[in-house]
Amino acid sequence: LDLLDGSNKPVVAAIHGTALGGGLETALCCHYRLAVGTAKFGLPEVHLGLLPGAGGTQRLPRAVGVEKALSMVTSGSPIGAADALASGLIDSIVEGDLRSEALAYAIEKASSSVSHPKLRDTDERLQDATDNPEIFNNVRKMIARKTRGFMAPENNIRCIEAAVSMPFDEGLKFENKLFMELMMGPQSKAQQYFFFAERQAAKVDGIGKDTQEIPINKVGVIGGGLMGGGIAMNMANVGIPVTIIETSQEALDRGLGTIRKNYENTASKGRISQEDVETRCGLIGG
């Protein structure tokens, strides 16, 4: 990555999709960044119990300012191209062909006598935090309830603090130290397991995209309590008739009454019409 921002020729990042994590860190090492209007940018490592480990915490605040950088690394949420342009993360949004415009941009910069900007040498966007160091504690207070007990958000903040208080190369060493602490610790392993397990749970092994759906014409639900009633309502909401099986007529009537009450409450809030209430209740019997 040092070869990118150390190049004496202009290095232009042409971003056409998502620049997340290492992708954004690579783009930050380039002298210029162009993107299409649908591009997304972010450093989501905090969701994996980590922090950006390739200079992201040191370059990002130099590009977008400390406050914006803190928001991005502690939330892990991506931002759009318009936001990236307004914050200084990218230099331009390309409307035409990205490749040809990026090449033209690089040729234009190569023909210029102006030196190519390196974020490692830029400190102007750090000044706000230098003048107001409380910005870091304010962020800590703001995210405290949501992130209590998690190490990654705090270490991300400490790295942004290092970007302000340390020379760039020292900040990189500090970032690497905290990154290794997180990577070798139990929290990141647990968060990474959770992250990938959650996505794997949405997939069913052996069922391909070409698998034909089986039409559902009617559903039977055993029990009309809290869970059974909720299942019945979900089916009725999409127009599928439901038969609830209960141990007694009394239990069945109670379950059907609760379902009607729930639909009536939803209608009173304007989310569905009274006609919808009757239609959906009419689909549920026992």
PLM regions and their residue ranges:
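Secondary-structure transition/capping motifs at alpha-helix termini
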Residues: 5-7, 35-38, 63, 67, ...
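Conserved catalytic cores of soluble enzyme domains
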Residues: 1-115
